[in-house]
Protein backbone atom coordinates (compact mmCIF):
# COMPACT_ATOMS: atom_id res chain seq x y z
CA UNK A 1 0.00 0.00 0.00
CA UNK A 2 0.98 3.62 -0.39
CA UNK A 3 -0.31 6.92 0.99
CA UNK A 4 -1.31 10.11 -0.82
CA UNK A 5 -2.70 13.42 0.42
CA UNK A 6 -6.48 13.76 0.23
CA UNK A 7 -6.87 17.37 -0.97
CA UNK A 8 -10.37 17.67 0.52
CA UNK A 9 -9.29 16.86 4.08
CA UNK A 10 -5.56 17.41 4.05
CA UNK A 11 -5.11 13.96 5.56
CA UNK A 12 -3.14 11.07 4.08
CA UNK A 13 -5.24 8.33 2.52
CA UNK A 14 -3.98 4.76 2.29
CA UNK A 15 -4.38 3.27 -1.16
CA UNK A 16 -4.17 -0.54 -1.35
CA UNK A 17 -1.43 -1.92 -3.56
CA UNK A 18 -2.42 -3.78 -6.71
CA UNK A 19 -2.52 -7.31 -5.22
CA UNK A 20 -4.71 -6.45 -2.23
CA UNK A 21 -7.63 -8.88 -2.07
CA UNK A 22 -6.46 -11.11 -4.89
CA UNK A 23 -7.40 -14.77 -4.66
CA UNK A 24 -4.71 -17.31 -5.54
CA UNK A 25 -5.28 -21.01 -6.13
CA UNK A 26 -2.51 -23.53 -5.52
CA UNK A 27 -3.00 -26.96 -7.11
CA UNK A 28 -0.57 -29.68 -6.03
CA UNK A 29 -0.35 -33.46 -6.30
CA UNK A 30 -2.19 -35.35 -3.58
CA UNK A 31 -0.17 -37.74 -1.46
CA UNK A 32 3.10 -36.85 -3.17
CA UNK A 33 4.92 -36.63 0.13
CA UNK A 34 6.11 -34.38 2.90
CA UNK A 35 7.76 -31.88 0.54
CA UNK A 36 4.42 -31.01 -1.07
CA UNK A 37 2.88 -30.54 2.37
CA UNK A 38 5.68 -28.12 3.25
CA UNK A 39 5.13 -26.26 -0.02
CA UNK A 40 1.39 -25.94 0.63
CA UNK A 41 1.97 -24.56 4.13
CA UNK A 42 4.56 -22.11 2.81
CA UNK A 43 2.09 -20.81 0.23
CA UNK A 44 -0.58 -20.38 2.89
CA UNK A 45 1.76 -18.57 5.29
CA UNK A 46 3.08 -16.18 2.66
CA UNK A 47 -0.37 -15.35 1.27
CA UNK A 48 -1.49 -14.50 4.79
CA UNK A 49 1.59 -12.33 5.28
CA UNK A 50 1.07 -10.27 2.12
CA UNK A 51 -2.72 -10.07 2.39
CA UNK A 52 -3.81 -12.43 -0.38
CA UNK A 53 -6.67 -14.90 -0.29
CA UNK A 54 -5.43 -18.48 -0.56
CA UNK A 55 -7.15 -21.63 -1.74
CA UNK A 56 -5.45 -25.02 -1.95
CA UNK A 57 -6.41 -28.07 -3.96
CA UNK A 58 -4.73 -31.46 -3.87
CA UNK A 59 -5.37 -33.25 -7.17
CA UNK A 60 -5.20 -37.03 -7.53
CA UNK A 61 -1.58 -37.93 -8.17
CA UNK A 62 -0.45 -38.65 -11.75
CA UNK A 63 -3.98 -38.41 -13.23
CA UNK A 64 -4.19 -35.71 -15.96
CA UNK A 65 -8.00 -35.74 -15.99
CA UNK A 66 -8.17 -35.02 -12.27
CA UNK A 67 -5.68 -32.16 -12.60
CA UNK A 68 -7.62 -30.68 -15.52
CA UNK A 69 -10.83 -30.84 -13.49
CA UNK A 70 -9.13 -29.04 -10.61
CA UNK A 71 -7.85 -26.29 -12.92
CA UNK A 72 -11.25 -25.89 -14.57
CA UNK A 73 -12.85 -25.61 -11.14
CA UNK A 74 -10.48 -22.75 -10.30
CA UNK A 75 -11.70 -20.95 -13.41
CA UNK A 76 -15.37 -21.65 -12.76
CA UNK A 77 -15.40 -20.35 -9.19
CA UNK A 78 -13.25 -17.35 -10.05
CA UNK A 79 -9.56 -16.88 -9.40
CA UNK A 80 -6.93 -14.22 -9.93
CA UNK A 81 -3.97 -16.57 -10.33
CA UNK A 82 -3.07 -20.25 -10.26
CA UNK A 83 0.13 -21.92 -9.11
CA UNK A 84 0.19 -25.53 -10.28
CA UNK A 85 2.42 -28.59 -10.16
CA UNK A 86 1.68 -29.61 -13.75
CA UNK A 87 1.66 -32.93 -15.52
CA UNK A 88 3.23 -32.95 -18.97
CA UNK A 89 0.11 -33.90 -20.90
CA UNK A 90 -1.83 -32.26 -23.79
CA UNK A 91 -5.05 -32.03 -21.78
CA UNK A 92 -3.25 -30.20 -18.99
CA UNK A 93 -1.79 -27.74 -21.49
CA UNK A 94 -5.33 -27.13 -22.76
CA UNK A 95 -6.60 -26.54 -19.21
CA UNK A 96 -3.80 -24.04 -18.62
CA UNK A 97 -4.71 -22.32 -21.90
CA UNK A 98 -8.33 -21.98 -20.78
CA UNK A 99 -7.14 -20.15 -17.69
CA UNK A 100 -4.75 -17.83 -19.50
CA UNK A 101 -7.31 -17.14 -22.25
CA UNK A 102 -9.55 -15.86 -19.45
CA UNK A 103 -6.78 -13.58 -18.22
CA UNK A 104 -5.69 -15.77 -15.30
CA UNK A 105 -1.89 -16.01 -14.92
CA UNK A 106 -0.55 -19.52 -14.28
CA UNK A 107 2.78 -20.37 -12.66
CA UNK A 108 4.30 -23.85 -12.93
CA UNK A 109 6.04 -24.95 -9.75
CA UNK A 110 8.56 -27.78 -9.09
CA UNK A 111 8.04 -29.16 -12.59
CA UNK A 112 7.56 -27.23 -15.82
CA UNK A 113 5.14 -27.23 -18.73
CA UNK A 114 7.25 -25.26 -21.22
CA UNK A 115 5.06 -25.68 -24.31
CA UNK A 116 2.03 -24.24 -22.51
CA UNK A 117 0.83 -20.68 -22.02
CA UNK A 118 1.94 -20.63 -18.37
CA UNK A 119 3.47 -17.34 -17.26
CA UNK A 120 6.66 -18.69 -15.68
CA UNK A 121 8.28 -21.67 -13.97
CA UNK A 122 9.68 -21.79 -10.43
CA UNK A 123 11.86 -24.69 -9.35
CA UNK A 124 15.17 -26.47 -9.76
CA UNK A 125 17.21 -26.69 -12.91
CA UNK A 126 16.26 -30.34 -12.88
CA UNK A 127 18.74 -31.55 -15.47
CA UNK A 128 21.58 -29.94 -13.53
CA UNK A 129 20.25 -31.48 -10.31
CA UNK A 130 20.22 -34.89 -11.98
CA UNK A 131 23.78 -34.40 -13.19
CA UNK A 132 24.86 -33.49 -9.67
CA UNK A 133 23.26 -36.68 -8.36
CA UNK A 134 25.02 -38.72 -11.04
CA UNK A 135 28.40 -37.16 -10.30
CA UNK A 136 28.07 -37.80 -6.58
CA UNK A 137 27.01 -41.43 -6.97
CA UNK A 138 29.68 -42.01 -9.59
CA UNK A 139 32.39 -40.83 -7.22
CA UNK A 140 30.95 -42.63 -4.21
CA UNK A 141 30.66 -45.95 -6.06
CA UNK A 142 34.23 -46.91 -6.92
CA UNK A 143 33.34 -50.59 -7.38
CA UNK A 144 31.79 -51.79 -10.68
CA UNK A 145 28.12 -52.64 -10.44
CA UNK A 146 24.53 -51.63 -11.11
CA UNK A 147 22.62 -48.48 -10.22
CA UNK A 148 18.83 -48.38 -9.91
CA UNK A 149 16.93 -45.19 -10.73
CA UNK A 150 13.43 -44.60 -9.34
CA UNK A 151 11.03 -42.02 -10.80
CA UNK A 152 7.37 -41.13 -10.31
CA UNK A 153 6.79 -41.39 -14.05
CA UNK A 154 7.11 -39.54 -17.34
CA UNK A 155 4.22 -37.17 -16.65
CA UNK A 156 6.57 -35.12 -14.48
CA UNK A 157 8.97 -33.33 -16.80
CA UNK A 158 11.16 -32.64 -13.77
CA UNK A 159 11.75 -36.36 -13.26
CA UNK A 160 12.56 -36.91 -16.93
CA UNK A 161 15.07 -34.06 -16.79
CA UNK A 162 16.66 -35.39 -13.62
CA UNK A 163 16.93 -38.83 -15.15
CA UNK A 164 18.47 -37.43 -18.34
CA UNK A 165 21.10 -35.51 -16.39
CA UNK A 166 21.82 -38.46 -14.12
CA UNK A 167 22.29 -40.90 -16.98
CA UNK A 168 24.40 -38.53 -19.08
CA UNK A 169 27.00 -37.99 -16.34
CA UNK A 170 27.32 -41.68 -15.47
CA UNK A 171 27.43 -42.71 -19.12
CA UNK A 172 30.16 -40.21 -20.00
CA UNK A 173 32.33 -40.38 -16.90
CA UNK A 174 31.75 -43.59 -14.97
CA UNK A 175 31.75 -46.50 -17.39
CA UNK A 176 32.20 -48.98 -14.55
CA UNK A 177 28.61 -48.27 -13.49
CA UNK A 178 25.68 -49.88 -15.28
CA UNK A 179 22.39 -48.00 -15.04
CA UNK A 180 19.41 -50.32 -14.93
CA UNK A 181 16.07 -49.66 -16.60
CA UNK A 182 14.20 -46.99 -14.65
CA UNK A 183 11.71 -48.13 -12.04
CA UNK A 184 8.46 -46.15 -12.11
CA UNK A 185 6.69 -46.08 -8.77
CA UNK A 186 4.31 -43.16 -9.14
CA UNK A 187 5.50 -41.70 -5.82
CA UNK A 188 3.73 -44.61 -4.11
CA UNK A 189 5.54 -46.08 -1.08
CA UNK A 190 4.09 -49.57 -1.49
CA UNK A 191 5.06 -49.80 -5.15
CA UNK A 192 8.56 -48.53 -4.41
CA UNK A 193 8.85 -51.07 -1.61
CA UNK A 194 7.79 -53.98 -3.81
CA UNK A 195 10.09 -52.97 -6.67
CA UNK A 196 13.07 -52.54 -4.33
CA UNK A 197 12.36 -55.84 -2.59
CA UNK A 198 12.18 -57.69 -5.92
CA UNK A 199 15.28 -55.94 -7.23
CA UNK A 200 17.33 -56.91 -4.18
CA UNK A 201 16.20 -60.52 -4.51
CA UNK A 202 17.18 -60.73 -8.18
CA UNK A 203 20.32 -58.58 -8.31
CA UNK A 204 23.42 -59.28 -6.24
CA UNK A 205 25.35 -56.61 -8.12
CA UNK A 206 23.34 -53.55 -7.02
CA UNK A 207 25.66 -50.83 -5.75
CA UNK A 208 23.52 -47.69 -5.63
CA UNK A 209 20.01 -46.25 -5.76
CA UNK A 210 18.89 -42.81 -6.87
CA UNK A 211 15.28 -41.80 -6.33
CA UNK A 212 14.43 -38.60 -8.20
CA UNK A 213 10.88 -38.58 -6.80
CA UNK A 214 9.17 -39.24 -3.51
CA UNK A 215 8.05 -42.28 -1.50
CA UNK A 216 11.52 -42.98 -0.14
CA UNK A 217 10.03 -44.78 2.84
CA UNK A 218 9.11 -47.72 0.60
CA UNK A 219 12.69 -48.06 -0.62
CA UNK A 220 14.01 -47.62 2.91
CA UNK A 221 11.75 -50.39 4.22
CA UNK A 222 12.98 -52.87 1.62
CA UNK A 223 16.64 -52.02 2.23
CA UNK A 224 16.30 -52.44 5.98
CA UNK A 225 14.40 -55.73 5.65
CA UNK A 226 17.13 -57.08 3.38
CA UNK A 227 19.91 -55.94 5.71
CA UNK A 228 21.35 -53.72 2.98
CA UNK A 229 21.50 -50.41 4.83
CA UNK A 230 25.29 -50.21 4.69
CA UNK A 231 25.77 -51.89 1.31
CA UNK A 232 23.90 -49.55 -1.04
CA UNK A 233 24.84 -45.95 -1.82
CA UNK A 234 21.60 -43.98 -1.76
CA UNK A 235 20.76 -40.55 -3.21
CA UNK A 236 17.33 -39.01 -2.63
CA UNK A 237 15.62 -35.73 -3.48
CA UNK A 238 14.14 -33.26 -0.98
CA UNK A 239 15.04 -33.00 2.68
CA UNK A 240 12.16 -34.35 4.76
CA UNK A 241 12.03 -35.83 8.28
CA UNK A 242 12.54 -39.26 6.67
CA UNK A 243 15.53 -38.32 4.53
CA UNK A 244 17.01 -36.29 7.38
CA UNK A 245 16.83 -39.29 9.68
CA UNK A 246 18.18 -41.46 6.87
CA UNK A 247 21.24 -39.24 6.58
CA UNK A 248 21.80 -39.42 10.32
CA UNK A 249 21.47 -43.22 10.37
CA UNK A 250 23.74 -43.73 7.37
CA UNK A 251 21.03 -45.14 5.09
CA UNK A 252 21.13 -42.08 2.82
CA UNK A 253 24.42 -40.71 1.53
CA UNK A 254 23.23 -37.48 -0.08
CA UNK A 255 20.00 -35.56 -0.53
CA UNK A 256 19.40 -33.13 -3.39
CA UNK A 257 17.20 -30.37 -1.99
CA UNK A 258 15.31 -27.25 -2.98
CA UNK A 259 13.97 -24.69 -0.54
CA UNK A 260 10.19 -25.12 -0.66
CA UNK A 261 9.56 -21.90 1.27
CA UNK A 262 11.62 -19.95 -1.26
CA UNK A 263 9.76 -21.62 -4.13
CA UNK A 264 6.41 -20.71 -2.57
CA UNK A 265 7.35 -17.08 -1.97
CA UNK A 266 8.82 -16.70 -5.43
CA UNK A 267 5.78 -18.14 -7.20
CA UNK A 268 3.44 -15.80 -5.33
CA UNK A 269 5.71 -12.82 -6.00
CA UNK A 270 5.54 -13.58 -9.73
CA UNK A 271 1.74 -13.44 -9.66
CA UNK A 272 1.86 -10.14 -7.78
CA UNK A 273 4.42 -8.72 -10.21
CA UNK A 274 2.14 -9.66 -13.10
CA UNK A 275 -0.65 -7.53 -11.65
CA UNK A 276 1.81 -4.71 -11.03
CA UNK A 277 2.55 -4.68 -14.75
CA UNK A 278 5.99 -6.26 -14.50
CA UNK A 279 7.18 -9.02 -16.81
CA UNK A 280 7.77 -12.21 -14.79
CA UNK A 281 10.62 -14.53 -15.70
CA UNK A 282 11.40 -18.12 -14.83
CA UNK A 283 13.16 -18.39 -11.48
CA UNK A 284 15.59 -21.20 -10.75
CA UNK A 285 15.67 -22.33 -7.13
CA UNK A 286 19.25 -23.18 -6.07
CA UNK A 287 20.19 -26.85 -5.90
CA UNK A 288 21.38 -27.79 -2.41
CA UNK A 289 23.53 -30.87 -1.78
CA UNK A 290 23.00 -32.13 1.75
CA UNK A 291 25.10 -34.78 3.47
CA UNK A 292 25.22 -35.72 7.11
CA UNK A 293 28.01 -33.25 7.89
CA UNK A 294 26.11 -30.20 6.61
CA UNK A 295 22.64 -31.31 7.66
CA UNK A 296 20.50 -28.35 8.79
Descriptions of predicted regions:
Residues 5, 170-171, 259-296:
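Hinge/cleft segment of the Venus flytrap/periplasmic-binding protein
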Residues 17-31:
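Interdomain hinge and pocket-entrance segments immediately C-terminal to HTH DNA-binding domains
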Residues 44-53, 167-176:
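Short helix-loop-beta junction
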